Amino acid sequence: MAKGQSLQDPFLNALRRERVPVSIYLVNGIKLQGQIESFDQFVILLKNTVSQMVYKHAISTVVPSRPVSHHSNNASGGTSSNYHHGSSAQNTSAQQDSEETE
């Protein structure tokens, strides 16, 4: 249960902290774009011209516009600002950043 969050939380937190523009694909195929303002166990607050509350169960993929370092394995001052989250069926993908960058 907590194992899934050990990847999701640092990834979303790095995107939020570095204000990386993201594309969020929903399970119905809709693409949302903006910056992650905040998140919790169930929702992501996405800011563009307006703020949108996006439920995580509706998200298929989160694609950053540029690579982001979300692991503190190389100890470059990894922060421990973990949110308390339960498990989610979200399918985040950090390796698709070159999908639409042409």
From Swiss-Prot:
It comes from the Bacteria. Residues 9-68 form the Sm domain. Keywords: RNA-binding, Stress response. One of its GO terms (molecular function) is RNA binding. Pfam families: Hfq (PF17209). PROSITE patterns: SM. One of its GO terms (cellular component) is cytosol. Residues 63-102 are annotated as: Disordered. The keyword RNA-binding applies. InterPro entries: Hfq (IPR005001), LSM_dom_sf (IPR010920), Sm (IPR047575). GO terms for biological process: regulation of DNA-templated transcription; regulation of RNA stability; regulation of translation, ncRNA-mediated. Residues 70-96 have a biased composition (Polar residues). Homohexamer. RNA chaperone that binds small regulatory RNA (sRNAs) and mRNAs to facilitate mRNA translational regulation in response to envelope stress, environmental stress and changes in metabolite concentrations. Also binds with high specificity to tRNAs. Belongs to the Hfq family. This is RNA-binding protein Hfq. It comes from Shigella boydii serotype 18 (strain CDC 3083-94 / BS512).
